[in-house]
Regions:
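Hydrophobic anchor residue at the start of the ABC signature
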Residues: 68, 96
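Conserved ABC ATPase signature
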Residues: 54-58, 62
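Helix N-cap at the start of a conserved alpha-helix in ABC-type nucleotide-binding domains
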Residues: 90-92
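Conserved catalytic motifs of ABC-family nucleotide-binding domains
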Residues: 75
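ABC ATPase C-loop
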Residues: 71-72
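Conserved ABC ATPase "signature" region
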Residues: 32-50
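Catalytic Walker B motif of ABC-type/P-loop ATPase nucleotide-binding domains
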Residues: 79-83
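Conserved beta-strand-loop-alpha-helix hinge in the C-terminal portion
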Residues: 136-149
Length: 149
């Protein structure tokens, strides 16, 4: 399971973006493939060209996008995201949500994503909505049928 926490500072361990991504990638591939994967995931989260950037120079939103890139590069079949767009501006939120949707819709590589959100507008990117009330599952339905109470 790939994980993305709400606060990226609780997840980032390495001094720059490339080294953070490297600890999440399968090392049994060629250096050329590693470089391609790093470029691809950074582009997917709007951070193309950031691979050598020191983590301490990143904004909170950039750190969050880096953690999402780390989850994507790990080639997991399931990603759990705890409010992955919480620290992002609206443009970055949309890019990340579209990326997650595109990746989960790609039938060549099965990927499921469960993300926790308090933002009603994010539901349109989901295939299903599970609502929790008082710690229990209270409903499971299509996003178009969900009504916020």
């Amino acid at each position: 399971i790939g994980m993305v926490f709400q606060n990226p500072d609780h997840q980032i361990l390495m001094p720059n973006c490339r080294s953070e991504l490297l600890i999440n990638i399968n090392q049994n591939i060629s250096q050329n493939e590693i470089n391609k994967k790093i470029e691809y995931v950074l582009d997917q989260v709007g951070m193309a060209g950031f691979e050598k950037r020191p983590v301490h120079t990143l904004s909170g939103g950039q750190k969050q996008r880096l953690t999402i890139a780390c989850a994507l590069i790990s080639n997991r079949n399931f990603i759990l995201l705890d409010e992955p767009t919480a620290l992002l501006d609206q443009t970055s939120q949309l890019k990340v949500l579209k990326t997650i949707k595109n990746l989960t819709s790609d039938h060549k590589k099965p990927l499921s994503a469960l993300w926790i959100t308090h933002r009603y507008e994010e539901l349109t990117y989901a295939d299903a909505v599970a609502e929790l009330k008082n710690g229990f599952l209270s409903s499971w339905q299509e996003p178009s049928k969900f009504q916020y109470n």
